[in-house]
């Protein structure tokens, strides 16, 4: 019986921090790339195929979240294209907005899948929680927004005065 012995130094990736070695380091929910389904040569390090450095993460295409604080409004955009409006809940809890989505197991083109997520966003101090609204676009982007309160304090210039003593004791201006 032939047993192949591999030198562990050759099989070990050069940058081990790029390859998950523990279960908590792995990225669950990532799609398998076609290249990962093909057998690799024993002489090639798994680093070349499995490293996140060489893979585009699926969150670049799905699941993006964007919070914007503009001059006159606050908004959150969240990609929820895998959920129907009935499977989504948006609520205000104190100074936080919580968005929760859940759908039970169902079949798709790859097999069966169940999804659930929860995201929280802090409501800015100048936003009235009672004015928050949400809408779902045709392409599956949930938008939660509210107007910002306009400041009652008018803008003014503050003059700068020059002092004759140093701010730091013992230092002198040269």
UniProtKB/Swiss-Prot annotation:
UniProt cross-references to InterPro entries, sorted A to Z: A-crystallin/Hsp20_dom, Alpha-crystallin/HSP_16, Alpha-crystallin/sHSP_animal, Alpha-crystallin_N, HSP20-like_chaperone
Modification type N-acetylmethionine: residues: 1
A biological-process GO annotation: protein stabilization
Region of interest (Disordered), ranges: 148-174
Cystine connections: none
Binding site for Zn(2+) 1: 82, 110
Bias-annotated ranges (Basic and acidic residues): 149-166
Role according to the record: May contribute to the transparency and refractive index of the lens.
Subunit-level organization: Heteromer composed of three CRYAA and one CRYAB subunits. Aggregates with homologous proteins, including the small heat shock protein HSPB1, to form large heteromeric complexes. Inter-subunit bridging via zinc ions enhances stability, which is crucial as there is no protein turn over in the lens.
Protein name: Alpha-crystallin B chain
Organism: Gallus gallus (Chicken)
